[in-house]
Amino acid sequence: MALKPEWKGYAWILLATVTGSTVYVFSKAALIEVSLFQFGFWWFSMAIGWNLLFTLRSPESRRIRIISRSTFKVLLIMGLVEMVATGAFYAAIEASANPSIPSFLRNMEYIFVTLLGIILLHERFRGWEIAGVILSITGAFVISYQRGGTLSSYLTGSSGLMLLCTSFYAIRTILAKKFIHTISPTQMAINRALFLFTLATVLLVVFGQSIRIPQSALISILAGSFLGPFLTSISQYSALKYIEASRAAIIQSTTALFTVTGVFLYFGKLPMAYQAVGGIITIGGVMLIMAGARLKATGESRNAKKMPTA
């Protein structure tokens, strides 16, 4: 029996959530041994390979499509946004002693998605959404708390990098949702990997670093690049074809819970008690934001049905 489209969407986003949590574990394991530029070179070169293999096996993806000028512009913008967002993301993981912390802070993306909706689409906040934003920001501050820390140390540390990362990821999310029916998930994933591989290669050459890395780091990158840039990206973009972004966001907000488990099993580390509390607060905030968005959408749908027809 074929799955309903909605259930396909839930299956895709659940897969993206679980595989996405492993990215924090494998990338941190590799970044302990190699530089950020070496990591990016191997991580995204492998991601390109995984995506090309998937393209060859998929009849839909094998169809040659001529990319229009407008599509090229969108892919260019998305690629540049990914350079900033993903570069800051992995820099945050490298800077953090426990990769669970960036995974909790990743939920700030939904705050920026909501704010961009207000700025670009002139949307209005509901009470639940306001409460969710306040709760998420509170949780982020709790997670980022450092006794004796300065604004400079915050901005250059893991928390500041995640602030930069999530603001740009929000732009990426809105672009992906808008163009998901004209640009395939595979095209988006390959475009992302190509831009990031190019950036890492240029920086590797500029700073005169070698592409030779330890075998243990290569194994971590091999596993992580399959689960992260390939499987997570394909799953995220595929889910958006079947379910609303708000539903996907609610499920993906729990990624940090899977990450905590993975980090504990791999590194034997757990977040501090106050960091765990802050993380749970941010997850609760995201769920309130998305619940408010769904209530608003439901209300607008009902009002549209009540409108008289000519």
Role assignments for model-derived ranges:
Residues 1-42, 84, 88, 151-178, ...:
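Glycine-/small-residue-enriched transmembrane alpha-helix faces in small-molecule transporters
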Residues 7-15, 37-57, 72-77, 132-135, ...:
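Hydrophobic alpha-helical transmembrane segments of multi-pass integral membrane proteins
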Residues 116, 128-147, 200, 253-254, ...:
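Hydrophobic transmembrane alpha-helices of multi-pass small-molecule transport proteins
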Residues 25-33, 61-64, 91-98, 144-155, ...:
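Membrane-interface helix termini and inter-helical loops of multi-pass transporters
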Residues 18-21, 25, 79, 83-87, ...:
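Hydrophobic/small/kink-forming positions within alpha-helical transmembrane segments
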